[in-house]
Amino acid sequence: MKPNITFILCCFLLLPNLSKSAEKKVYGLNEYVRLIDIDLEVPAKLDTGAETASLSARNIKYFKRHGERWVSFKLAIDGSHTRVIERPLEGIDQIKRRADDRGSHDRSLYSNRPAILLTVCMGEASRTIEVNLTDRSAFQFPLLIGSEALKRFDATIDPALRYAIGKPRCASIAQKAE
């Protein structure tokens, strides 16, 4: 009789963990994401092995506005994105470089990337996340969303799925103004 009580107690201890996993949303390895601040939809790779989020950008320039540090850039997605985007600089992220990204004379293990805050929408959920800027034009996906941002979405990633939650359904800035 005693082993049955132990088993029942163990089951009750596991119940809170089961309810937590039920609350998480299952996303695919790739999802469509709306960058609400920029009013643009892009395909993204959801990568639990990366810590930060990265957006493909070029012509990155730092400047000051009213004593604050800002960054300007153009999206490095395709030739049609020529608009200059300006955002407050949130900070500088140090990103560990892959060995094949370093030249024979370049010994630095980290690259410094400007980081900004962007509001992103996946499915019906929108969150403000930190995104660093780097030229990702050699990659298939212009946006990589890492584990820190995925935590904010309470996301569980199923790598067997692609575009599991469909198109973003959050209101854009233009829709909110109406």
For each feature predicted by the language model, list its residue ranges.
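Bacterial N-terminal signal peptides that target proteins for export
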Residues: 1-7
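Bacterial N-terminal signal peptides
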Residues: 7-16
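Pepsin/retropepsin-fold aspartyl endopeptidases
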Residues: 21-178
